[in-house]
């Protein structure tokens, strides 16, 4: 401890210009992994010397990592600092021999020429329950290593924090600094997803998914625990199998409990931070990578996951093994793709999330919407005064600003009203999707008629991914949309589709028209409809002939 203070106090307090290695790191990563928009956002945010940005790194299972592993991770901490964030390392209250592990971590940081200081009791609990956080952040290049203790004035005694999520949220809510990132390092990696064959969820929108995930893990845990307890009416073979699998059952239970704690940590911590803050869970091996697909470094630069969460499941495996996908960074390091070492498979990104409203009115009326044009005004007498109404004024506004054209709302509603499949609204109309029923009366299909995201939020918060995920879950078997042939987003659309058709093609029986659109369709590629020429002809004909509703 004395050596740590000597190192910190003898460090000159001044601004450190990035060295050649630092500049090279920033430029190489910017050139290889991010879009122009992301590069601009990163440079605007993290190269301003007057604004200080911090990231919390919560280390679980610290005692289980070898010195070689910790040495590799210390290099990532150095990269985080070089990229403009000030890391604050926090030791898990459940860690064995906290003092020794903190000193061990401190030594590895020092070996990387990093300056760190161990903070023994960062939180003081007053006699009346007040919380005071004291964190000696001496200069941009001194890294605090926080031990999970709280000093209680009433008892005049230092206690180990019991609940990691409460400790972290108390710490964060009382720190007067800008915390942009919350990184959690766990030997188990991100939260497991059934849809991804127990590989990690790519992205979690907590306001939408927290409760569902918590209940799912709780149900799985109860099933595992019931297997251990229920020995009644088991024959000798079943009892023997249970005995032989006991260690595996206990291991799975421990892992599930850890994932539930990680989910709680992210939910409580991000709930007291701004909406712009991002959480991320990964393994220490993934977080130690020196290649471009280090999920911590990548998220600092892009504020997103290594791969898009809205990629269809049948494309994710291909994307994980191919570097040609738009969302995947290139890497000079060729590695065998396995769940143990592939960053994509062990990383989950979190956002506090934004409100989502889904309106499933087939027909819009004055009872369920606001701003209905006079030509469409009707009342059913079935109004629910509690239910939220669709605001057509705001809906029209985001469509106009996103498409940079003026929608003829009366003409548009005249076409879709009575055939609405669903309308999805994100936040305060910061993202929307309008889905309609199109096609033959006896066999209609769902068509994404309008999709818009506010200009200020394009490429951020994962809004596009959230909308597409919602649509894919709601209409998993058949979903169609079209896009202009010169639309720069078409590559993104292609990755989320099962197939693409040019709408200028000859549909047979002399049915051919010039069209500026491509048709994209989504669903199970093994489904009969996607191998049925007549069904594909229906898609093309009805989507091609939809009349636009823009003011001229």
UniProtKB/Swiss-Prot annotation:
PROSITE patterns: GNAT_NAGS
Subcellular location: Mitochondrion
Transit peptide: 1-32
One Gene Ontology cellular component annotation held by this UniProt entry: mitochondrial matrix
Biological process, per Gene Ontology: L-arginine biosynthetic process; ornithine biosynthetic process
Reactions accelerated catalytically: L-glutamate + acetyl-CoA = N-acetyl-L-glutamate + CoA + H(+)
Main location: mitochondrion
Keyword set includes Transferase: yes
Keyword Transit peptide annotated: yes
Enzyme class: transferase
Keywords associated with the record: Acyltransferase, Amino-acid biosynthesis, Mitochondrion, Transferase, Transit peptide
Disulfide bonds: none
Documented EC number(s): 2.3.1.1
Gene Ontology terms, MF aspect: L-glutamate N-acetyltransferase activity
PANTHER family according to UniProt: AMINO-ACID ACETYLTRANSFERASE, MITOCHONDRIAL, N-ACETYLGLUTAMATE SYNTHASE
Function recorded in the entry: N-acetylglutamate synthase involved in arginine biosynthesis.
Protein name (record): Amino-acid acetyltransferase, mitochondrial
Primary gene name: ARG2
